[in-house]
């Protein structure tokens, strides 16, 4: 999160100082084809899929780290690609654009 904030500050400074049309695009939790299914450092959705697969394969219970209650927003990787193309062509604001579905769900939500 800190790196994203710092990148946004840098982009704003470049826009102001050099007059370039840089924008800040911030996606929420991404999932999709060719994702990182590593349990330790992958994204939320593929990590959970891999954890569930291993639990079923080894006939072990499936556990989720933490309470599973925090609300998160997820977005499909191909939607991120389309929205990024749109932002490059159409978006010209100094405020960052957050790519999100605006649907908040918890990991425990049915």
Report residues per predicted region:
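Ca2+-coordinating acidic residues in Ca2+-binding motifs
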Residues: 26, 79, 109
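Hydrophobic residues at beta-strand termini and immediately following loops
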Residues: 25, 64-65, 99
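Conserved cofactor-binding/catalytic machinery of classical short-chain dehydrogenase/reductase
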Residues: 6-7, 76-79
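Catalytic Tyr-x(3-8)-Lys segment
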Residues: 66-70
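Active-site Tyr-X1-5-Lys
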Residues: 1-28, 44-58
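Glycine/proline-rich active-site loop of Rossmann-fold NAD(P)-dependent oxidoreductases
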Residues: 30-47, 57-61, 77-78, 86-99, ...
């Amino acid at each position: 999160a800190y790196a994203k904030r710092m990148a946004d500050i840098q982009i704003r400074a470049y826009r102001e100082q050099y007059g370039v049309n840089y924008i800040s695009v911030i996606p929420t939790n991404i999932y999709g084809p060719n994702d990182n299914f590593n349990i330790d450092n992958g994204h939320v959705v593929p990590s959970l899929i891999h954890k569930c697969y291993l639990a079923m394969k080894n006939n072990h219970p499936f556990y989720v780290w933490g309470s599973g209650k925090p609300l998160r927003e997820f977005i499909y990787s191909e939607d991120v690609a389309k929205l990024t193309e749109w932002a490059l062509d159409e978006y010209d604001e100094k405020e960052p654009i957050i790519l999100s579905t605006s649907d908040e769900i918890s990991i425990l939500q049915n």
